Amino acid sequence: LFLPGLMGAAILQVNILISRLLAYSLDESAVSVLYLASRLMELPLGVFTIAVATVFFPLLAKALSNHDETAFSSAFLQGFRLVVGISVPAGIGLFVLGEPIIELLFLWGAFEKADVLATVPLVAIYGIGLPLYSAATFATRGLHASKDMRTPVRVAGYCLLINLFLGLLLMQFWGAAGLAAANVLAALAQSWLLWRALSARRPGISCHALRPALSKVLLAGAIMGLFCALAWSFLAGFGLNEKLSSALVVSVCVPGGATVYFILLYLLRFEELATLKAMFLSHFAKR
């Protein structure tokens, strides 16, 4: 059971690896920018989404061992709301602030402004895909808790083929950005297929139950993104050099955007706000 479970959970890494191999047929810079963009996306995925999945997995398994479908559905939906509440603003942040983040982290030595501009579209694409990767990760844990190892593996196989086909096709038109887009479209297919399989197995899990939370998160995330874009535009007018300007933008927009987001979730009465806030505070308290 370990190897099938590993394959089902690791399809994201496999698809990104395939995209990197395909990128070698473009040019060396395509490999580099694809690697950097995917690593930026994997940071919030690994720090927050996988942490939520790890915490909720034993709760899901315990509920099923007690034959308590209601407890399973309740725990899964709570965890999924947390995953959405984390991944959506993180993805919007990458989409809006990709350029200053890349400049701050990587604009050193041989990595020049042209490389930054080549990486920005890929970071934006992966930012769009982050909620999909997160949804697929958590849905996989839900199926594993149900002792269903075959479905994630079967879905992973389908998505590997989707990613390969779309990668070969889209790279002809958009280069490295096409490879990133293929990853995201494969993640869309994976998250939809896994959710469909889990909801068929567990009737208590439905999209209808998540609509209120998803609407609140999308609204708060959109306003947060607008705040970040306006703040970046304002701070860019200070006339600082690229490095100082990007450091100022990131240091203001990231905590400022998070504050705006949490205030909006509070006003919208998002169900898991207290848990979400505790996760952020505990993570940054360790830093």
What are these regions (language model features)?
Residues L1-R287:
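Membrane-embedded alpha-helical bundles of multi-pass transporters/translocases
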